[in-house]
Amino acid sequence: MLKRREPDMFKRVLLKLSGEFLAGDNGFGISPETTAELARRIIGALDGTEVELAVVIGGGNLWRGARNGQGMDPATADYIGMLGTVMNAMALQDAMEAAGKPTRIMSAIHMQQVAEPYIRRRAMRHLEKGRVVIFGGGNGAPFFTTDTTSTLRALEIGADVVLMAKNAVDGVYDSDPRKNPDAKRYEQLTHMDVVEQRLEVMDATALTLCMDKGLPIVVFDIFEEGNLARLLRGERVGTLIQSRG
């Protein structure tokens, strides 16, 4: 039987965001208004807590290697996508700092004019000082998704959990709830449940790393007002995935 997390359990979290969250109604590019609203939600959730927050953001609003990179060298297409994540990190940093929250971007691909190089201990120090750390540039190597980067960075910085943010999907279902009105939502699962049932949570490399290291995952709808704040307080939101307790 799984043990559900208790309130105030989370001290340090890794929030995984889709780059498409920044696109707004256009579905592509960066909408300053949408990005500002996302920043507001994140900052509002942190207010009044001592939770340390790191963020990994994808680049799908700017580039998708499988679609945009057809005919290209696969590694080159992936590197273009990684550069896109730094662009998104800069947009999110700008929105968060405009709202008064100190942030730092750390990139696995060196570009010192816009981001600090990723150094694990420096990232942890920023978090201890109350800064939000946004990781860009993937993990610096092609052929890995930002899901895998999220898991890797979470383990490196000692995060308690990976929060997989979704839009209009409030957890993990046994089938696509947008296509099947009778789809069942899970409150909690084990990592092995996700593997055996082939549930779409994150890519296999990222999920295996979470399972091997016992890193919990919470899948939730970040655009449902108050969800992130409730999560950071330890309340039940979305679907919890963890090792068998």
Swiss-Prot record:
Instruction: State where ATP binds.
Output: K16, L17, S18, G19, G60, R64, N167, Y173, D176
Q: Which UniProt keywords apply?
A: Allosteric enzyme, ATP-binding, Cytoplasm, Kinase, Nucleotide-binding, Pyrimidine biosynthesis, Transferase
What EC number(s) does the entry state? 2.7.4.22
Where is this chain's protein located in or outside the cell?
A: Cytoplasm
PANTHER family reported for this sequence: URIDYLATE KINASE (PTHR42833), URIDYLATE KINASE PUMPKIN, CHLOROPLASTIC (PTHR42833:SF4)
Any inhibitors or activators noted? Allosterically activated by GTP. Inhibited by UTP.
Supply the gene name. Answer: pyrH
**Cellular component GO terms, alphabetically?**
cytoplasm
Statement: the UniProt record of this protein carries the keyword Repressor: no
Tell me the pathway.
Pyrimidine metabolism; CTP biosynthesis via de novo pathway; UDP from UMP (UMPK route): step 1/1
Task: State what protein this is by name.
Answer: Uridylate kinase
